[in-house]
Amino acid sequence: MDLHLEGKVVFVTGGFKGIGKGIALQLAREGAVPVVLNRKDGVEDEFRAEISEITKTFEMYYIDLNDTDAIAPIVEEVYKKYGHIDGVVNNAGRNDNLELETTSWQDFEKSLHGNLTHYFELVHETCPYLKESKGSIVNIASKVALTGQGKTTAYAAAKGAILGLTREWAAALVHDSVRVNAIVVAEAWTPLYANWIKTFGDEEAQQKRLSLITDRIPLEHRMTSVEEIADTTCFLLSDRSSHTTGQWCNVDGGYVNLDRALD
């Protein structure tokens, strides 16, 4: 299926690895122009080499998204160069495991800023151009906003807000034909997830923990791949989903909405 993304300029935050990288690479395969925002974290050269094998038309900006004021100049530069902005994928963020009883309000607010504010600012700055192009926004969220997890108070608050903003922005921009949707991720195999699994001990202990998790995923009892999330994201960015807005799309093998006791 042709997603009609050829030449579309799409921002992707946190795009050097994990889910963001998968989305950026898939956009490149579809002929889009990925504009990747990410801090320097040691993998930028590897990412550049990998995406360069797919396309020569992409942009990379080194930015700490906690520095919210740095977003607007990048948006203006991209618009000036290409003359249009067609999509935004808000992806960057991390689960910092800040729990209720041991987290100060200052650290809570800092976490919200790091996981939420840049979602707002990037859409705020690109909004006039998305109206021009009748573009699409995809916010990457997490199942912790829907299910709770424990020990994720700040992260759950940010991801819950992202789901709320998805529907608010969909309503606010519906008359401009700008579509806004969210991808709700549950258990996805990423470098961050792999590092987390390693904290459970030796290889046998890691495998035991991983099996406990995958056994609860109804569809095929396996983790969701980055590529599966990227494919759904690209579909939502494309005109092939032209009458889809305000939706929370769970890409999770049925983890949230199906009975986890299913054999």
Ranges and model annotations:
Residues A182, E204-R240, T244, V251-G253:
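C-terminal helical subdomain
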Residues T147, C234, T245-D263:
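Short C-terminal tail/terminal secondary-structure segment
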Residues E99-L100, S104-L112, I213:
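Substrate-binding pocket helix/loop in short-chain dehydrogenase/reductase
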Residues V123, A158, T166:
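Active-site helix of classical SDR
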Residues P128, A171-H175, S242:
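Alpha-helical segment proximal to the catalytic Tyr-Lys
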Residues F16-G18:
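Conserved glycine-rich cofactor-binding loop
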Residues S142:
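Residue(s) in the substrate-gating loop at a strand-loop-helix junction
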